[in-house]
A protein has these predicted regions:
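Structured catalytic/nucleic-acid-binding cores of DNA maintenance enzymes
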Residues: 1-181
């Protein structure tokens, strides 16, 4: 299994992959939940897909065939990868219209940043979320770039931010404490 942005990619036997996006309320569980929508039978075990709001999505595709999965086919670089550089971010922000928060959340610009982390990044950088992306100075873009790396590394180390009863595979809630909310 691997991850790309907010997509989970499961390599199956043969030439196929199962692509899952949990959206806001989706969960993969080892026990049946109130909102179980699908049960996977794997080597004598069961894996339950639970989704209160029915927003999650699944795709069964040939390995590497992501062109028909809208968000995955056009996804930008991972924010903690070597391909997410300061020069890349400067180039994108100077060309992209719209408010900086919306641009950061655009998965074609940078993979995996959602509402909470966009707010955290901009707060750390001292940039108003409603600022037009094209109006940012080089110094402000550098602050956003550095804040992106810092906030996401902190969140990863803390197991992420947890709303409601969402937990990791070991049943533990994330301990990242947002500064904005």
């Amino acid at each position: 299994m691997r991850r790309r942005g907010k997509y989970l990619i499961f390599e199956l036997d043969g030439d196929e992959e199962l692509i899952i996006h949990l959206r806001m309320t989706g969960q993969l569980r080892l026990n049946e939940g109130e909102y179980t929508r699908l049960i996977f039978h794997i080597d004598g075990m069961k894996l339950y897909f639970s989704d209160l709001r029915r927003m999650g999505e699944m795709h069964l595709v040939r390995k590497g065939s992501y062109e028909n999965i809208e968000g995955l086919a056009t996804m930008g670089p991972e924010p903690l990868s070597e391909s997410f550089t300061l020069s890349y971010l400067m180039d994108v922000l100077r060309k992209k219209g719209g408010k900086i928060k919306a641009v950061l959340m655009d998965q074609a610009v940078v993979a995996g940043i959602g509402n909470i982390y966009a707010n955290e990044i901009l707060f750390e950088a001292g940039i108003h979320p409603g600022r037009p992306a094209k109006s940012l100075t080089q110094k402000e873009i550098e602050a956003i770039y550095n804040a992106t790396k810092k906030i996401l590394q902190e969140a990863l180390a803390a197991g992420g931010e947890t709303f409601s009863n969402y937990v990791n595979i070991y049943g533990e809630a994330g301990t990242y404490q947002p500064r904005v909310y």
